[in-house]
Amino acid sequence: MDAIKKKMVAMKMEKKNALDRAEQLEQKLRETEEAKAKIEDDYNSLVKKNIQTENDYDNCNTQLQDVQAKYERAEKQIQEHEQEIQSLTRKISLLEEGIMKAEERFTTASGKLEEASKAADESERNRKVLENLNSGNDERIDQLEKQLTEAKWIAEEADKKYEEAARKLAITEVDLERAEARLEAAEAKVIDLEEQLTVVGANIKTLQVQNDQASQREDSYEETIRDLTNRLKDAENRATEAERTVSKLQKEVDRLEDELLTEKEKYKAISDELDATFAELAGY
């Protein structure tokens, strides 16, 4: 009887210990599940941060490309304006040369006109001399008539030269007016281009400032990208470590569940044995 009582006491103690171990295992299992859930939350947070980091990286690259494109367009516009200014400068030089040649032709024509006028005056004087002469021999008259004829011919030639000079002068004046009109248009174009160049210069300064700022932002972006890359690597390492930790915890959970199941089976066996013992005692 004492042996049975001792056995019952031992079985009760073993049952109590099994219950305690089962409670401890359940508590440990709950803590493990909570730790697993926390690690999974941290892992999800790291994944979100990783996605945000990649988005920030893409935005930085996009802004940098936009700044570079604007700078290239500004450089192209400046080159086009410079080429246009050079072309107009060449045209102005050609117009100035044309004006100088026209002035030379005008000076030559004026000289010829003056010579023709002098010849006409001389012929007129000879004609008056002939009219005033009332006497003289026929030879003198013939000579004077010849001189008169020659004077008329010289006057006619002078008139022709004068008309040709006047015609050339008129053409020269038309050419000069056209050249002056082209020159005025060119000067207006130059003024307009100078104004545009001033605007472009201001834009260049603005772009240079923006470029400097963009360079600073680019340096900042590069620093940010390096920081984000390091953070990304750190996040990936932490995510990898978290995955390993989750895997280890999952194994621990599985082990604890197996151990809990074993303890429950032991508890059931002890309970069955106690029930059998009580039934045996009741039979006495």
UniProtKB/Swiss-Prot annotation:
Keywords recorded for this protein, A-Z: Allergen, Coiled coil, Muscle protein, Repeat
Q: Where does the record place Basic and acidic residues bias?
A: 110-130
Q: Which Pfam families does the record match to this protein?
A: Tropomyosin
An example GO BP is: regulation of muscle contraction
This protein's source sits in the domain of life called: Eukaryota
State the SUPFAM superfamilies in the record. Answer: Tropomyosin
Q: Name one GO molecular function term.
A: protein homodimerization activity
Q: Which family does it belong to?
A: Belongs to the tropomyosin family.
PANTHER family attached to this UniProt entry: TROPOMYOSIN
Q: What does this protein do?
A: Tropomyosin, in association with the troponin complex, plays a central role in the calcium dependent regulation of muscle contraction.
| UniProt subunit comment | Homodimer.
**What does its UniProt record remark on the domains?**
The molecule is in a coiled coil structure that is formed by 2 polypeptide chains. The sequence exhibits a prominent seven-residues periodicity.
Q: What is this protein called?
A: Tropomyosin
